[in-house]
Curated annotation (Swiss-Prot):
HAMAP family: UPF0756. This is UPF0756 membrane protein ETA_17460. GO terms for cellular component: plasma membrane. Belongs to the UPF0756 family. Keywords: Cell membrane, Membrane, Transmembrane, Transmembrane helix. The keyword Cell membrane applies.
Length: 148
């Protein structure tokens, strides 16, 4: 029997691969393996906790240079003294807030996830974008829809 969901996931994985969005490719392939094995019983947990675990791992990656000392504390302190750094802080706050709205939208309206992924893949492949867009795109969409 034809599995449309599997076909869509394989199509998105191929599209991601050819647009050099390896993180999405790997994520989709892992989900395909989970779907096709007894591990599929972990989907309720993944659906409930996946975003939280992913954000924890992302936060660890972002904070690692501070923890390791690659970014010295003196550099962090100077961030509060220069207009460019203050602007960067303000933008960081805005983008974090936007990403939070995106997580909420993606959790409450999963029908938008496919469109956000396809838009990100097109942005990466055709416009030399960077594949960090789905959460921010969802946040912008939530502003447009008035959700969150």
């Amino acid at each position: 029997m034809f599995d449309l969901t599997l076909a869509i996931m394989l199509f998105l994985a191929a599209l991601s691969y050819f647009s050099h969005n390896i993180t999405v490719t790997i994520a989709l392939l892992v989900l395909i393996v989970i779907r096709m094995t007894p591990l599929q019983q972990t989907f309720p947990w993944i659906e409930k906790q996946g975003m939280t675990v992913g954000i924890i791992i992302l936060t660890i990656g972002v904070m690692a240079p501070i923890a390791s000392g690659t970014i010295p504390s003196s550099t962090l302190m100077h961030s509060f003294l220069h207009w460019k750094s203050l602007t960067a802080i303000a933008i960081g706050i805005f983008v974090s807030w936007l990403g939070g709205r995106g997580v909420t939208l993606m959790s409450t309206q999963p029908t938008v996830v496919g469109g956000l992924l396809i838009g990100t893949i097109i942005g990466v492949s055709l416009f030399r974008g960077v594949p960090v867009g789905p959460l921010i795109a969802a946040g912008l969409l939530s502003l447009m829809l008035g959700k969150g």
